[in-house]
Regions:
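Serine residues within intrinsically disordered or low-complexity segments
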Residues: 13-16, 38
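N-terminal basic, low-structured, amphipathic or hydrophobic segments
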Residues: 13-14, 29-32
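Class II aminoacyl-tRNA synthetase catalytic cores and aaRS-like
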Residues: 53-640
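Short, Lys/Arg-enriched N-terminal segments with co-localized hydrophobic residues
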Residues: 34, 40-59
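Gram-positive cell-envelope targeting signals
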Residues: 23, 27-30, 39-41
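Short, low-complexity S/T/E/D/G/P-rich linear segments that nucleate or cap local secondary structure
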Residues: 13, 21-23, 43-46
Length: 640
């Protein structure tokens, strides 16, 4: 903004004659001065005189409004004000009409006694309204809005933004509209205050995270968006190079290599709110294409020190932003090994709000005569609850729906005996052993899942969740955190039978080089860890492999020779020749964090411009075709 020379003369005049910044400078903001002086001049005067309230002066220096709606109060009664916003609703009460005017901050009722003012006024127009602030009749107070005791009697309405088309949906009920329509008209959907509040909330959480990390001594450093493609992880989004024919950049799936290189560079603590790009399918808790992480890394740090940082920042954020009355797990968080998680919860993302636990009864049933259990992994869940025949039928339907052949169970009767289809296959002499093994007592029901180990764990986890939800056992109003650690370093592809990395290839194997050289790869654990909250994976992290000799061996086991390591991860390979420090970190997901805090079931509700489930931007039309000229410039020809 530029301030005209004549206006600077006026600023000097006001400064000379009214250094206290009282009456005259405030008089400048009267409506007649709005058109005499530019916004730049008014802004300059406001900041020359600190006596003007900061909140109001920032909204007073333009011709469209004197103040935003949340700042109109009973102190303004009988004053003339100009306000601006969108026409949310128009109501005709016979002789007098009302407009509900909405801006980003609040809604205010406007009284129209001159019907000619409403000529050409439509819902969702952007308007500026001038009038007198009045006290509402007490019986018309609206305690649901900040301006509920006042209204503006209009004597001038200016249309600032016309509505040329019929609205595709009602703004106030946009969340009830089909998702594809909402996403196509996202700029209208975001006018819905509930939708907008999610984005405002997101901004506040991110600001808090930045502040917290800075207070903890971390430096915010941005890493490149255009980088080299790497063979691990999900599919890359690739970007063709114009200057280098046949070569491509990739959008980063995470700032993994760059943040490790920062540690090699001598930085001690790094963080950023990092955009990450992965060409993978959508889920309720995973947005396709792009997502954001609170990415951080620490030099000369152990796993326990990273745990402490993760606990401090997440506990602080959740305690600050959780809905009123919610409990948040205090540090230190429970630590559950991957093996324990798969056994007791049937998943590596355990929901600790569910009190049910899974038991392994495989060995016991090898002594019984029930053929479907012999030679299989058998899991059991004990539940103390009254369950009707109808409940059992619905649970069986659920079980078959997820692929189970059936769902065995036993009920413990008043006399301590068992009732159920499996009872006759348990010899009497083994029933006391079974009672001790399962901890079962009168009123309990024990459900059984049997299959190969991985499938049995999956089925047990699904049944545990279904039981917890349908029996209303899930703890309410709580955020329950835990760490899951000791993940397997390697896994075998069931189809190719080849050994590959289970998760992050840059993790340090437990036992170091000795383990890599002497142990079965499938028995080697990694210093990898997740943070899980209410069954949602919030973060992954690891102690990094900073020893080149260990890294070469780890990649060799996963099928990559040293030349591939040099080619695909050349920067790390070379940097680690020059004294790489031990380092570790993690990256909590910002989108998932906000989804949990807002109680949303779909992650797209907390993203300003999300793609749909097919990774399409319905509003802007991405992905889109490009011209032949654009393709030629990057040396690409599209095949049919």
């Amino acid at each position: 903004m530029r301030v005209k020379y004549k206006e600077w003369e006026d600023v000097r005049s006001f400064t000379s004659f009214n250094a206290g910044g009282t009456a005259d400078n405030i008089r400048l903001f009267a409506p007649e001065y709005k058109f005499k002086y530019s916004g730049a001049f008014l802004y300059a005067v406001a900041h020359t005189f600190p006596g003007i309230d900061h909140e109001r002066r920032m909204t007073m220096s333009n011709i469209y409004r004197d103040v935003t709606l949340e700042h109109v109060t009973e102190a303004d009664i009988d004053k003339e004000l100009r306000i601006a916003g969108w026409v949310e609703n128009i109501r005709d009460h016979g002789g007098v009409s009302f407009i509900d005017l909405r801006d980003m901050y609040a809604v205010m009722q406007v009284v129209i006694r001159d019907s000619s003012l409403l000529k050409g006024i439509r819902k969702e127009q952007a308007v500026s309204i001038k009038g007198i602030v009045e006290k509402r009749d007490e019986e018309t107070y609206n305690p649901k809005i900040p301006t509920g005791t006042i209204e503006l009697e209009a004597h001038e309405i200016d249309i600032l933004g016309e509505v040329y088309k019929n609205l595709p949906f009602e703004i106030q009920t946009s969340k009830e509209v089909r998702e594809d329509v909402r996403l196509k008209y996202r700029y209208l959907d975001l006018r819905n205050q509930k939708v907008k509040d999610n984005i405002i909330f997101r901004s506040k959480v991110i600001s808090f995270l930045r502040q917290k990390m800075t207070e903890m001594g971390f430096l915010e450093i941005q890493t490149p968006i255009l980088c080299a493609s790497s063979p691990e992880g999900a599919r890359d989004y690739i970007v063709p190079s114009r200057k280098f024919k046949g070569k491509f950049y990739a959008l980063p799936q995470a700032p993994q290599q760059y943040k490790q290189l920062l540690m090699v560079s001598g930085f001690d603590k790094y963080f950023q709110i990092a955009p990450c790009f992965r060409d993978e399918d959508a889920r309720a808790d995973r947005s396709p294409g792009e997502f954001y992480q609170l990415d951080f890394e620490m030099s000369f740090a152990t796993q326990e020190e990273v745990f402490a940082v993760g606990e401090e920042v997440l506990t602080a954020a959740f305690e600050k932003f959780a809905p009123e009355g919610y409990e948040v797990t205090k540090a230190p968080y429970p630590i559950i090994s991957y093996k324990q998680a798969m056994l007791e919860f049937g998943t590596d993302k355990p929901d600790l709000r569910n009190p049910l636990r899974i038991m392994d009864v495989t060995e016991f049933f090898q002594k019984c005569t029930f053929k479907p259990f012999i030679g299989r992994t058998v899991r059991a869940i004990r539940v103390h609850a009254d369950m009707s025949k109808g409940f059992h039928e619905k649970l069986l339907k659920f079980a078959t729906g997820i692929g189970m052949g059936g769902l065995g169970y036993l009920e413990v009767l008043e006399d301590g005996s068992y009732k159920g289809p499996i009872d006759k296959f348990i010899p009497d002499e083994l029933k006391e052993e079974f009672r001790t093994l399962t901890g079962s007592g009168v009123g309990d029901t024990i459900f059984f899942m049997a299959d190969k180990e991985e499938r049995a764990a999956y089925y047990a986890g699904m049944i545990r969740t279904e039981l917890g939800e349908k029996l209303d056992l899930i703890e309410k109003n709580a955020y329950r955190f835990c760490y899951v650690n000791d993940f397997p370093m390697f896994e075998k592809d069931p189809d190719t039978k080849k050994i590959g990395f289970t998760h992050n290839p840059f993790s340090m194997p437990q036992g170091g080089l000795e383990a890599l050289e002497n142990k079965d790869p499938l028995d080697i654990l990694a210093y990898q860890y997740d943070i899980v909250c209410n069954g949602v994976e919030l973060s992954s992290g690891a102690v990094r492999n900073h020893d080149m000799q260990i890294m070469v061996k780890a990649f060799e086991i996963a099928g990559y020779d040293e030349e591939v390591l040099k080619e695909k991860f050349g920067a790390l390979y070379n940097a680690f020749q020059y004294g790489a420090p031990p380092h570790a970190g993690m990256a909590p997901g910002v989108d998932r964090m906000i989804m949990l805090l807002r109680g949303e079931d779909n992650i797209r509700e907390v993203i300003a411009y999300p793609m749909n489930g097919n990774a399409e931007d319905l509003m802007c039309g991405a992905p889109s075709t490009v011209t032949e000229q654009q393709l030629r410039e990057v040396h690409i020809k599209v095949r049919d």
